[in-house]
Amino acid sequence: MEILPASLRDLGSLRRVEQACFLKDAWPLLDLIAVLTWPDVIRLKAIEDGLMVGFLAGDPRSSEHMAWISTIGVLPEYQRRGIGRALLRECEKRLPQPCLRLCVRISNEPAIHLYQQEGYLSVDTWREYYNDKESALVMEKTR
């Protein structure tokens, strides 16, 4: 498995990963184009056997002295192999901000557990954040 920078050439693969991982919450096409082209965003893809199996975008917000992990997803059949952890760690290396945040569905216990293992703490809950009205847990890592 390799972690590499992602680009607009990866749009089709990213769309497949996004739809497989997030079903009803998958980002629309224009948002995917934006995340692959927006300046300063850290875009990483996980490749296994020539296939994109995971993606992460990190959004540095230097004026706020923080960064957001905008999205992280690994194809379901490749989960629990350390790919999400590898993407997260590589992105953290590339983001200089002292504070990192992300949000996750409150029902996504495997992801919450991973983030806790990586030093993220729950700092807020956004009520009815997702399309189906499920709340999001906001997690933060200070370094």
Label the model's feature ranges.
Residues 22, 55, 78, 114, ...:
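Conserved hydrophobic/aromatic "anchor" residues
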Residues 5-79, 85-94, 142-143:
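Acetyl-CoA-dependent GNAT
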